Regions:
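Metal-dependent active-site segment of extracytoplasmic phospho-/sulfohydrolases and closely related
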Residues: 269, 275-301, 306
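Feature for exported/extracytoplasmic and membrane-associated proteins, marking the mature portion
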Residues: 1-279, 311, 315-376
Protein backbone atom coordinates (compact mmCIF):
# COMPACT_ATOMS: atom_id res chain seq x y z
CA UNK A 1 0.00 0.00 0.00
CA UNK A 2 1.05 3.57 -0.64
CA UNK A 3 2.28 5.69 2.26
CA UNK A 4 0.43 8.78 1.04
CA UNK A 5 -2.69 9.90 2.88
CA UNK A 6 -4.56 10.12 -0.42
CA UNK A 7 -6.52 7.06 -1.52
CA UNK A 8 -4.68 4.92 -4.07
CA UNK A 9 -6.02 5.22 -7.62
CA UNK A 10 -5.78 2.81 -10.56
CA UNK A 11 -5.80 3.91 -14.20
CA UNK A 12 -6.26 1.28 -16.91
CA UNK A 13 -5.23 1.61 -20.56
CA UNK A 14 -6.74 -1.12 -22.73
CA UNK A 15 -4.94 -1.93 -26.00
CA UNK A 16 -7.75 -3.39 -28.09
CA UNK A 17 -7.06 -5.76 -30.94
CA UNK A 18 -4.39 -8.01 -29.45
CA UNK A 19 -0.94 -6.47 -29.09
CA UNK A 20 1.94 -8.53 -30.48
CA UNK A 21 4.00 -9.52 -27.44
CA UNK A 22 6.92 -10.83 -29.50
CA UNK A 23 7.47 -7.47 -31.18
CA UNK A 24 6.87 -5.45 -28.01
CA UNK A 25 9.29 -7.08 -25.59
CA UNK A 26 11.54 -8.83 -28.06
CA UNK A 27 13.48 -12.07 -27.36
CA UNK A 28 16.21 -10.85 -29.70
CA UNK A 29 18.82 -13.39 -28.55
CA UNK A 30 16.63 -16.39 -29.35
CA UNK A 31 17.33 -17.61 -32.92
CA UNK A 32 13.79 -18.97 -33.04
CA UNK A 33 12.51 -15.38 -33.03
CA UNK A 34 14.14 -14.65 -36.39
CA UNK A 35 13.20 -18.10 -37.71
CA UNK A 36 9.52 -17.55 -36.96
CA UNK A 37 9.47 -13.92 -38.04
CA UNK A 38 11.14 -13.79 -41.47
CA UNK A 39 9.16 -10.67 -42.43
CA UNK A 40 7.74 -9.20 -39.21
CA UNK A 41 10.61 -8.78 -36.78
CA UNK A 42 12.71 -6.05 -35.21
CA UNK A 43 16.44 -6.37 -35.93
CA UNK A 44 18.74 -6.79 -32.95
CA UNK A 45 20.55 -3.51 -33.60
CA UNK A 46 17.26 -1.62 -33.12
CA UNK A 47 16.20 -3.35 -29.90
CA UNK A 48 16.40 -1.28 -26.70
CA UNK A 49 18.02 -4.00 -24.63
CA UNK A 50 16.95 -4.87 -21.10
CA UNK A 51 19.45 -7.70 -20.67
CA UNK A 52 21.27 -10.29 -22.77
CA UNK A 53 18.01 -11.91 -23.85
CA UNK A 54 15.14 -9.44 -24.24
CA UNK A 55 14.56 -5.79 -25.02
CA UNK A 56 12.00 -3.15 -25.94
CA UNK A 57 10.71 -2.36 -29.41
CA UNK A 58 12.36 1.00 -30.27
CA UNK A 59 8.92 2.62 -30.48
CA UNK A 60 8.63 2.10 -26.71
CA UNK A 61 11.58 4.39 -26.00
CA UNK A 62 9.61 6.62 -23.58
CA UNK A 63 8.46 3.58 -21.59
CA UNK A 64 12.03 2.21 -21.63
CA UNK A 65 13.15 5.49 -20.03
CA UNK A 66 10.57 5.00 -17.26
CA UNK A 67 11.68 1.37 -16.93
CA UNK A 68 15.28 2.51 -16.44
CA UNK A 69 14.00 4.74 -13.61
CA UNK A 70 12.47 1.70 -11.90
CA UNK A 71 8.88 2.78 -12.58
CA UNK A 72 7.74 0.02 -14.97
CA UNK A 73 6.95 -3.63 -14.29
CA UNK A 74 6.81 -5.87 -17.36
CA UNK A 75 4.53 -8.88 -16.88
CA UNK A 76 5.48 -11.65 -19.31
CA UNK A 77 3.28 -14.47 -20.56
CA UNK A 78 -0.03 -13.09 -19.34
CA UNK A 79 -3.15 -15.04 -20.20
CA UNK A 80 -5.57 -17.71 -18.96
CA UNK A 81 -6.26 -21.44 -19.46
CA UNK A 82 -7.90 -22.60 -22.70
CA UNK A 83 -7.37 -19.26 -24.49
CA UNK A 84 -10.01 -17.87 -26.79
CA UNK A 85 -8.81 -16.13 -29.95
CA UNK A 86 -11.96 -14.11 -30.54
CA UNK A 87 -11.51 -10.41 -29.80
CA UNK A 88 -14.95 -10.14 -28.25
CA UNK A 89 -14.85 -13.26 -26.12
CA UNK A 90 -11.26 -12.85 -24.95
CA UNK A 91 -11.80 -9.21 -23.99
CA UNK A 92 -15.00 -10.25 -22.24
CA UNK A 93 -12.99 -12.78 -20.21
CA UNK A 94 -10.49 -10.10 -19.21
CA UNK A 95 -13.35 -7.76 -18.32
CA UNK A 96 -15.39 -10.20 -16.22
CA UNK A 97 -12.79 -12.74 -15.00
CA UNK A 98 -15.15 -15.48 -16.23
CA UNK A 99 -13.24 -17.78 -18.66
CA UNK A 100 -15.75 -20.61 -18.39
CA UNK A 101 -18.98 -18.68 -18.93
CA UNK A 102 -20.28 -15.32 -20.11
CA UNK A 103 -20.18 -13.00 -17.12
CA UNK A 104 -22.54 -10.11 -16.51
CA UNK A 105 -20.40 -8.04 -14.13
CA UNK A 106 -17.06 -6.37 -14.74
CA UNK A 107 -14.15 -6.80 -12.36
CA UNK A 108 -13.85 -3.06 -11.80
CA UNK A 109 -17.61 -2.74 -11.40
CA UNK A 110 -17.37 -5.26 -8.55
CA UNK A 111 -14.38 -3.41 -7.10
CA UNK A 112 -16.27 -0.10 -7.18
CA UNK A 113 -19.19 -1.73 -5.38
CA UNK A 114 -16.82 -3.07 -2.71
CA UNK A 115 -15.27 0.35 -2.18
CA UNK A 116 -18.53 2.32 -2.30
CA UNK A 117 -21.41 -0.11 -1.63
CA UNK A 118 -24.01 2.64 -1.30
CA UNK A 119 -22.89 4.51 -4.41
CA UNK A 120 -22.21 7.69 -2.48
CA UNK A 121 -19.63 8.96 -4.98
CA UNK A 122 -20.92 8.88 -8.55
CA UNK A 123 -17.35 9.34 -9.79
CA UNK A 124 -15.66 6.39 -8.08
CA UNK A 125 -15.25 4.99 -11.60
CA UNK A 126 -14.81 7.06 -14.78
CA UNK A 127 -14.28 5.89 -18.36
CA UNK A 128 -12.91 8.00 -21.19
CA UNK A 129 -14.04 6.91 -24.64
CA UNK A 130 -17.13 5.66 -26.43
CA UNK A 131 -19.58 3.49 -24.55
CA UNK A 132 -18.84 1.76 -21.28
CA UNK A 133 -16.35 -1.14 -21.12
CA UNK A 134 -17.84 -4.23 -19.54
CA UNK A 135 -15.02 -4.20 -16.98
CA UNK A 136 -16.71 -1.20 -15.32
CA UNK A 137 -20.28 -2.45 -15.58
CA UNK A 138 -22.22 -3.90 -12.64
CA UNK A 139 -25.86 -3.52 -11.60
CA UNK A 140 -26.42 -0.48 -9.42
CA UNK A 141 -22.86 0.81 -9.84
CA UNK A 142 -22.69 4.39 -11.19
CA UNK A 143 -19.88 5.00 -13.68
CA UNK A 144 -19.40 8.13 -15.78
CA UNK A 145 -18.34 7.64 -19.40
CA UNK A 146 -16.85 10.67 -21.12
CA UNK A 147 -16.13 11.27 -24.80
CA UNK A 148 -14.36 14.61 -24.40
CA UNK A 149 -13.74 16.16 -21.01
CA UNK A 150 -13.34 19.67 -22.45
CA UNK A 151 -16.94 19.66 -23.70
CA UNK A 152 -18.42 17.26 -21.15
CA UNK A 153 -21.34 18.33 -19.02
CA UNK A 154 -25.07 18.79 -19.18
CA UNK A 155 -26.46 21.38 -21.60
CA UNK A 156 -23.19 23.20 -22.10
CA UNK A 157 -23.22 26.25 -24.36
CA UNK A 158 -26.38 27.92 -22.98
CA UNK A 159 -26.68 30.62 -20.35
CA UNK A 160 -27.01 29.77 -16.65
CA UNK A 161 -30.72 30.62 -16.28
CA UNK A 162 -31.76 28.41 -19.19
CA UNK A 163 -29.49 25.63 -17.97
CA UNK A 164 -30.86 25.74 -14.40
CA UNK A 165 -34.42 25.60 -15.70
CA UNK A 166 -33.64 22.65 -17.97
CA UNK A 167 -31.82 20.80 -15.19
CA UNK A 168 -34.82 21.29 -12.92
CA UNK A 169 -37.03 19.68 -15.56
CA UNK A 170 -34.58 16.78 -15.96
CA UNK A 171 -34.36 16.40 -12.20
CA UNK A 172 -38.14 16.11 -11.84
CA UNK A 173 -38.28 13.76 -14.82
CA UNK A 174 -35.66 11.50 -13.23
CA UNK A 175 -37.10 11.70 -9.71
CA UNK A 176 -38.72 8.37 -8.80
CA UNK A 177 -42.48 8.36 -8.60
CA UNK A 178 -44.47 6.27 -6.11
CA UNK A 179 -45.39 2.85 -7.45
CA UNK A 180 -43.06 2.88 -10.45
CA UNK A 181 -41.32 -0.34 -9.44
CA UNK A 182 -37.71 -1.47 -9.18
CA UNK A 183 -36.78 -0.95 -12.83
CA UNK A 184 -37.95 2.66 -12.93
CA UNK A 185 -36.39 3.34 -9.54
CA UNK A 186 -33.09 2.05 -10.86
CA UNK A 187 -33.35 4.10 -14.05
CA UNK A 188 -34.25 7.27 -12.20
CA UNK A 189 -31.36 6.75 -9.75
CA UNK A 190 -28.98 6.13 -12.66
CA UNK A 191 -30.23 9.22 -14.46
CA UNK A 192 -29.63 11.44 -11.46
CA UNK A 193 -26.17 9.92 -11.00
CA UNK A 194 -25.38 10.81 -14.61
CA UNK A 195 -26.48 14.40 -14.05
CA UNK A 196 -24.40 14.70 -10.89
CA UNK A 197 -21.34 13.12 -12.48
CA UNK A 198 -21.53 15.32 -15.57
CA UNK A 199 -21.79 18.47 -13.50
CA UNK A 200 -18.82 17.57 -11.30
CA UNK A 201 -16.56 16.33 -14.11
CA UNK A 202 -17.17 19.42 -16.21
CA UNK A 203 -15.16 21.42 -13.64
CA UNK A 204 -11.99 19.31 -14.01
CA UNK A 205 -10.35 21.30 -16.84
CA UNK A 206 -10.62 24.58 -14.92
CA UNK A 207 -8.83 23.00 -11.93
CA UNK A 208 -5.94 21.86 -14.14
CA UNK A 209 -2.70 23.54 -15.11
CA UNK A 210 0.28 21.89 -16.78
CA UNK A 211 3.27 22.59 -18.99
CA UNK A 212 3.16 19.05 -20.42
CA UNK A 213 2.19 18.94 -24.10
CA UNK A 214 0.43 15.68 -24.94
CA UNK A 215 0.35 14.30 -28.48
CA UNK A 216 -2.45 15.09 -30.91
CA UNK A 217 -4.06 11.65 -30.87
CA UNK A 218 -6.93 10.03 -29.00
CA UNK A 219 -4.82 7.95 -26.58
CA UNK A 220 -2.80 11.01 -25.54
CA UNK A 221 -5.89 13.15 -25.08
CA UNK A 222 -7.68 10.50 -23.02
CA UNK A 223 -4.60 10.06 -20.83
CA UNK A 224 -4.61 13.82 -20.37
CA UNK A 225 -8.29 13.62 -19.37
CA UNK A 226 -7.42 10.92 -16.83
CA UNK A 227 -4.68 13.15 -15.41
CA UNK A 228 -7.08 16.12 -15.23
CA UNK A 229 -9.70 14.10 -13.37
CA UNK A 230 -7.16 12.62 -10.98
CA UNK A 231 -5.59 16.00 -10.25
CA UNK A 232 -9.05 17.50 -9.57
CA UNK A 233 -9.44 15.10 -6.60
CA UNK A 234 -13.06 14.06 -7.06
CA UNK A 235 -12.48 10.86 -5.07
CA UNK A 236 -12.23 8.79 -8.27
CA UNK A 237 -10.52 5.44 -7.64
CA UNK A 238 -10.66 3.85 -11.10
CA UNK A 239 -10.00 5.62 -14.41
CA UNK A 240 -10.20 3.76 -17.70
CA UNK A 241 -9.57 4.33 -21.39
CA UNK A 242 -9.07 2.32 -24.56
CA UNK A 243 -6.73 2.71 -27.52
CA UNK A 244 -8.76 3.24 -30.74
CA UNK A 245 -10.99 0.24 -31.32
CA UNK A 246 -9.05 -2.86 -32.46
CA UNK A 247 -6.09 -0.73 -33.55
CA UNK A 248 -3.63 -3.39 -32.32
CA UNK A 249 -5.18 -6.04 -34.60
CA UNK A 250 -2.15 -6.11 -36.89
CA UNK A 251 -2.97 -8.75 -39.51
CA UNK A 252 -1.24 -6.70 -42.23
CA UNK A 253 1.27 -3.88 -42.49
CA UNK A 254 2.40 -4.54 -38.95
CA UNK A 255 5.94 -3.21 -39.08
CA UNK A 256 4.73 0.31 -39.80
CA UNK A 257 1.40 0.25 -37.97
CA UNK A 258 2.55 -1.42 -34.76
CA UNK A 259 5.48 0.97 -34.35
CA UNK A 260 3.26 3.99 -34.97
CA UNK A 261 0.74 2.80 -32.37
CA UNK A 262 3.38 2.20 -29.74
CA UNK A 263 4.97 5.53 -30.54
CA UNK A 264 1.71 7.23 -29.58
CA UNK A 265 0.98 5.03 -26.57
CA UNK A 266 4.46 5.18 -25.06
CA UNK A 267 4.66 8.96 -25.47
CA UNK A 268 1.23 9.28 -23.84
CA UNK A 269 2.35 7.15 -20.88
CA UNK A 270 5.50 9.26 -20.48
CA UNK A 271 3.53 12.52 -20.65
CA UNK A 272 0.95 11.18 -18.21
CA UNK A 273 3.66 10.39 -15.66
CA UNK A 274 5.35 13.76 -16.18
CA UNK A 275 2.01 15.56 -15.78
CA UNK A 276 1.24 13.79 -12.50
CA UNK A 277 4.69 14.56 -11.13
CA UNK A 278 4.40 18.23 -12.08
CA UNK A 279 1.06 18.41 -10.25
CA UNK A 280 2.22 16.44 -7.19
CA UNK A 281 -0.31 13.75 -8.05
CA UNK A 282 1.90 10.78 -8.94
CA UNK A 283 2.32 9.15 -5.54
CA UNK A 284 -1.19 7.70 -5.37
CA UNK A 285 -1.57 6.65 -9.03
CA UNK A 286 -0.71 3.34 -10.70
CA UNK A 287 -1.32 2.60 -14.39
CA UNK A 288 -2.11 -0.85 -15.82
CA UNK A 289 -1.68 -1.43 -19.58
CA UNK A 290 -3.13 -4.67 -21.01
CA UNK A 291 -4.44 -6.34 -24.16
CA UNK A 292 -6.82 -9.26 -24.70
CA UNK A 293 -4.26 -11.66 -26.24
CA UNK A 294 -0.94 -11.82 -28.05
CA UNK A 295 -0.28 -12.82 -31.67
CA UNK A 296 0.82 -16.01 -33.42
CA UNK A 297 4.50 -16.86 -33.14
CA UNK A 298 4.94 -17.22 -36.91
CA UNK A 299 4.18 -14.18 -39.04
CA UNK A 300 1.83 -14.29 -42.03
CA UNK A 301 4.11 -12.36 -44.38
CA UNK A 302 2.92 -8.85 -43.55
CA UNK A 303 1.47 -9.13 -40.07
CA UNK A 304 0.48 -11.59 -37.39
CA UNK A 305 -2.75 -13.38 -36.54
CA UNK A 306 -4.57 -13.89 -33.24
CA UNK A 307 -2.59 -15.73 -30.59
CA UNK A 308 -2.70 -16.31 -26.84
CA UNK A 309 0.01 -15.39 -24.29
CA UNK A 310 0.65 -11.65 -24.07
CA UNK A 311 2.36 -8.89 -22.13
CA UNK A 312 1.12 -6.31 -19.63
CA UNK A 313 2.76 -3.27 -18.06
CA UNK A 314 2.29 -1.67 -14.65
CA UNK A 315 3.61 1.88 -14.31
CA UNK A 316 3.96 4.24 -11.38
CA UNK A 317 6.02 5.76 -8.60
CA UNK A 318 5.16 2.89 -6.24
CA UNK A 319 5.88 0.11 -8.72
CA UNK A 320 8.86 -2.16 -8.11
CA UNK A 321 10.20 -2.00 -11.63
CA UNK A 322 11.58 -5.02 -13.43
CA UNK A 323 10.61 -8.08 -15.44
CA UNK A 324 8.14 -10.50 -13.87
CA UNK A 325 7.62 -14.04 -15.09
CA UNK A 326 9.50 -16.06 -17.67
CA UNK A 327 9.40 -15.39 -21.38
CA UNK A 328 7.29 -18.20 -22.89
CA UNK A 329 9.35 -20.67 -24.91
CA UNK A 330 9.46 -20.37 -28.70
CA UNK A 331 10.31 -24.07 -29.10
CA UNK A 332 7.69 -25.66 -31.31
CA UNK A 333 7.00 -28.50 -28.86
CA UNK A 334 6.24 -25.96 -26.13
CA UNK A 335 3.86 -23.79 -28.13
CA UNK A 336 0.10 -23.97 -27.78
CA UNK A 337 -1.17 -24.61 -31.29
CA UNK A 338 1.44 -22.21 -32.64
CA UNK A 339 1.01 -19.64 -29.87
CA UNK A 340 2.95 -18.60 -26.79
CA UNK A 341 1.83 -20.41 -23.64
CA UNK A 342 0.69 -18.20 -20.79
CA UNK A 343 2.53 -18.55 -17.48
CA UNK A 344 0.93 -15.72 -15.51
CA UNK A 345 -2.83 -15.79 -15.00
CA UNK A 346 -4.24 -12.30 -15.57
CA UNK A 347 -6.41 -12.75 -12.47
CA UNK A 348 -3.22 -12.91 -10.42
CA UNK A 349 -2.20 -9.60 -11.99
CA UNK A 350 -5.57 -8.09 -11.08
CA UNK A 351 -5.38 -9.57 -7.57
CA UNK A 352 -1.98 -7.99 -7.00
CA UNK A 353 -3.26 -4.55 -7.98
CA UNK A 354 -6.50 -4.86 -5.99
CA UNK A 355 -4.97 -6.14 -2.76
CA UNK A 356 -1.52 -4.55 -2.70
CA UNK A 357 -2.53 -1.21 -4.20
CA UNK A 358 -6.26 -0.51 -3.86
CA UNK A 359 -6.49 -2.42 -0.57
CA UNK A 360 -9.52 -4.65 -1.07
CA UNK A 361 -9.98 -8.42 -0.98
CA UNK A 362 -9.56 -9.64 -4.54
CA UNK A 363 -11.13 -13.09 -4.27
CA UNK A 364 -14.73 -11.97 -4.74
CA UNK A 365 -13.71 -9.61 -7.56
CA UNK A 366 -11.65 -12.02 -9.68
CA UNK A 367 -13.52 -15.19 -8.75
CA UNK A 368 -10.97 -17.04 -6.66
CA UNK A 369 -7.45 -17.00 -5.31
CA UNK A 370 -4.60 -16.59 -7.79
CA UNK A 371 -0.86 -16.26 -7.36
CA UNK A 372 0.10 -12.64 -6.85
CA UNK A 373 3.25 -10.89 -8.02
CA UNK A 374 5.85 -8.72 -6.30
CA UNK A 375 5.69 -5.56 -8.44
CA UNK A 376 3.86 -3.66 -5.68
Amino acid sequence: MTSTKKDPVLAVLQLSGGNDALNTIIPYADPLYADNRPSVRVSEDQVLKIDDHIGFNPALGPIKDLFDQGKVAIILGVGYPNPNRSHFRSMDIWHTCEPEKVGNEGWLGRAIRDLDPRGENVLTGVNFGRGLPRSLAAPGVPVASVGNLETYGVLTGIDDDQRDEALDIFSRMYSPAIGRGQVMDYLSHTGMDALKGADILSTAPEKYSSTVEYGNNSVAQYMRNIAQTHIAEFGTRFLYTTAPYNSFDTHAGQMVGHSALWGEVSAAVRDFQADLIENNAADNMTLLVFTEFGRRVHDNGSGTDHGSGGIAFVVGENVKGGVYGEYPSLEESKLLEGDLHFNNDFRGLYSTVLEKWIGIDAKSVVGGEFEQMAFL
